[in-house]
From Swiss-Prot:
Chief subcellular location: cytoplasm
Gene source species: Leptospira interrogans serogroup Icterohaemorrhagiae serovar copenhageni (strain Fiocruz L1-130)
The organism's place on the tree of life at top rank: Bacteria
GO BP term (any one): arginyl-tRNA aminoacylation
InterPro entries: Arg-tRNA-ligase, Arg-tRNA-synth_N, Arg-tRNA-synth_N_sf, ArgRS_core, DALR_anticod-bd, Rossmann-like_a/b/a_fold, tRNAsynth_Ia_anticodon-bd
Name of this chain's protein: Arginine--tRNA ligase
Motif ('HIGH' region): 133-143
Taxonomic placement: Bacteria, Pseudomonadati, Spirochaetota, Spirochaetia, Leptospirales
Keyword Nucleotide-binding (UniProt): yes
Gene3D superfamilies (UniProt xref): Arginyl tRNA synthetase N-terminal domain, HUPs, Isoleucyl-tRNA Synthetase, Domain 1
Record's keyword terms, sorted: Aminoacyl-tRNA synthetase, ATP-binding, Cytoplasm, Ligase, Nucleotide-binding, Protein biosynthesis
Subcellular compartments: Cytoplasm
Entry GO MF terms: arginine-tRNA ligase activity; ATP binding
UniProt-listed SMART domains: Arg_tRNA_synt_N, DALR_1
UniProt xrefs under Pfam families: Arg_tRNA_synt_N (PF03485), DALR_1 (PF05746), tRNA-synt_1d (PF00750)
Encoding gene per record: argS
Length: 586
């Protein structure tokens, strides 16, 4: 057994060897054409793993699946060191039950030795960009979901040996940023006693009139946080002097641009505070503005033109994105020479490529599916392989309270922020928030049940796991922390004990598979099933350590220690604490 193998890999390798042995007597069969795979048994009564090899390859084998399965069982049964039982279930399934001794040995070399996870043969340098929220306001709930999942993905990828840089892209350039500055300026002038139209009725009012009459743009920002920022700017002596001078000179556009910079700086400070409170730390904050200042946005056009993917149309420069699955070709430079947002995005990803990343992963918000093909095409036109760039869509979050959806709206100022959510959930906000956001696949909408999230009983899936960990800690406090692998090896194995051993041994492969698939929700699914197996073990009378003989107690304690390690390490990977003692909030 290699140290760098999961239990599933060991079983699969054994199956492959057995299949090769079986078909060596079938000279007419091509070995390379076979599909050989295993999966977890759908019903634990049949075994730990199963394979439908004979059914899936019946046409290639040109033999009865039942007969092939029986012959395969005969070969596999010789591996008594690995399998306790191998049997056949019609119409062609082979079931495996791992031997207790093998499970114990495997657990000793993995979960109990600190070598939790196998490492990839070729570690990659990976750029993982997520959250990247507009710096126009506080982080919202969708950003919180991306933060929890992106951070967990990074932890999983690092756990199996990859080098990962977590990156936040700051969209601090463009018209929306200018409108943010105008919105702040409107509030500043209001605080100084100026009167003006509170809201533009149409979206075609010239900017000069908007600024002159102190009109809040239709696409501006109306949240209370804008008023707070305006107030804080006026309280800053240096900024207040600048504001006074520019107002007197009626240099409203210049002041609006300055207000945009100040507002973004303020918002970024609060966004980072929210992320810190959520346990998310980025390796790099990358400003879009720096790309424009370094002339990297327009200069990337040369690369695109060299690729032959640009054509002229009505004075515009257009990227042939339809060649990559887009529904129409996309303008990258307007007829007045200004770049579109797409060109800035292309320049940003060129910068990532130049930084030497083997893989580039982006997590985007809902409703961005259509953008994938055009950016992926641009990345390919720059010479980067399609398979090395991947976009993951983080779908919408629905907050539910008493079974009803809670509305969210950023510009109207009535949205729920990441900070609101953490505060609402109390002292457990970080743990509960991160766990709930990771519970479902990112590509599916998430219903976030606020009532369940506030529940501090074991009905709450987070507390269910934390209570399990705390129970084990209390066991060790009661009977001491001494354990014995020799005592564990001679324990009589009840169904609860054997089931728990298998779930412990599954931990490395569950993490390895979750990391490779970039699906953090697999970890929470596994941990819930694991905790159920531990609870069944814990409640069984013959597993009460304080009532057991010394030898049995030491053996059971060894199993409990492994279970504790799984819970602690599993929760750590998703950014959730594993307390030794549970205390309810008053």
């Amino acid at each position: 057994m290699k140290e760098n193998e999961t239990l599933k890999q060991i079983v699969l390798k054994t199956l492959e060897e057995s299949v090769n042995s079986l078909i060596s007597s079938f000279p007419e069969v091509e070995k390379e054409a076979f599909k050989i795979k295993i999966e977890y048994s759908r019903d634990e009564k049949f075994g730990d793993y199963s394979t439908s090899f004979a059914l899936e390859n019946s046409k290639l084998l040109k033999r009865n699946p039942i007969q092939v399965s029986k012959e395969l069982v005969e070969i596999l049964q010789k591996r008594t060191d690995l399998f306790e039982k191998v049997d056949f279930t019609p119409p062609g399934f082979v079931n495996f039950r791992i031997s207790t001794s093998f499970l114990l040995n495997y657990i000793e070399t993995s979960v109990l030795s600190g070598n939790y996870f196998p490492k990839v043969d070729l570690p990659l340098k990976i750029n993982l960009e997520f959250v990247s929220a507009n710096p126009t306001g506080p982080l919202n709930i969708v950003s919180a979901r991306a933060a929890a999942n992106g951070d967990t993905m990074a932890s999983l990828l690092k756990a199996i040996g990859h080098n990962v840089d977590k990156e936040f892209y700051i969209n601090d350039y463009g018209n929306q940023v200018f409108l943010l500055g105008v919105s702040t300026l409107v509030r500043i002038r209001e605080l100084k006693g100026e009167e003006g139209t509170q809201q533009e009725t149409t979206d075609d009012t010239p900017i000069e009139i908007i600024l002159e009459k102190n009109i809040l743009p239709a696409e501006g920002y109306r949240g209370e946080y804008i008023k707070d920022i305006a107030s804080s700017l006026l309280k800053d002596p240096k900024k207040n002097v600048t504001i006074e001078n520019l107002l007197k000179q009626k240099k409203y556009k210049e002041l609006a641009e300055l207000c945009a910079v100040w507002t973004i700086e303020n918002n970024l400070i609060w966004q980072r505070k929210d992320l810190d409170a959520f346990g998310v730390e980025f390796d790099c904050y990358f400003s879009e503005r720096t790309l424009h200042e370094a002339d990297k946005v327009l200069s990337v056009m040369k690369d695109l033109e060299k690729s032959g993917k640009i054509f002229q149309e009505d004075g515009k420069k257009v990227f042939r994105s339809t060649e990559y699955g887009d529904d129409k070709d996309r303008v990258v430079v307007r007829d007045d020479g200004r770049p579109t947002y797409l060109l800035a995005d292309i320049a940003y990803h060129k910068d990532k490529i130049e930084r030497g990343y083997d893989k580039i992963y982006d997590i985007w918000g809902p409703d961005h599916h259509g953008y994938i093909s055009r950016l992926s095409g641009a990345v390919q036109s720059l010479g980067y392989k399609k398979e090395n760039f991947k976009v993951i869509i983080s779908q919408q979050v629905n907050l539910l309270e008493s079974g009803q959806k809670v509305k969210m709206s950023k510009r109207a100022g009535s949205f729920q922020t990441m900070s609101d959510l953490i505060g609402f959930l109390g002292k457990h906000g970080k743990d509960v928030g991160r766990y709930f956001f990771v519970m479902r696949s990112l590509d599916a909408p998430l219903d976030f049940d606020l009532d369940l999230a506030k529940d501090e009983s074991d009905k709450n899936p987070v507390f269910y796991l934390q209570y399990a960990h705390a129970r084990i800690c209390s066991i060790f406090k009661e009977v001491g922390d001494q354990t014995s692998k020799e005592a564990a090896a001679i324990l009589e194995m009840s169904e609860e004990r054997k089931r728990l051993l298998f779930w412990i041994a599954r931990f490395p492969e569950e993490i390895f598979d979750s990391a490779n698939a970039m699906e953090p929700h697999r970890v929470t699914n596994y941990l819930q099933s694991f905790a159920k197996a531990f609870t069944s073990f814990y409640l069984a009378k013959d597993n009460r350590l304080k009532d057991a003989s010394k030898e049995v107690r030491l053996g059971l304690a060894r199993i409990c220690l492994a279970a504790k390690n799984v819970l602690a390490e599993g929760l750590k990977l998703i950014g959730v604490s594993a307390p030794e003692r549970m205390e309810k909030e008053n």
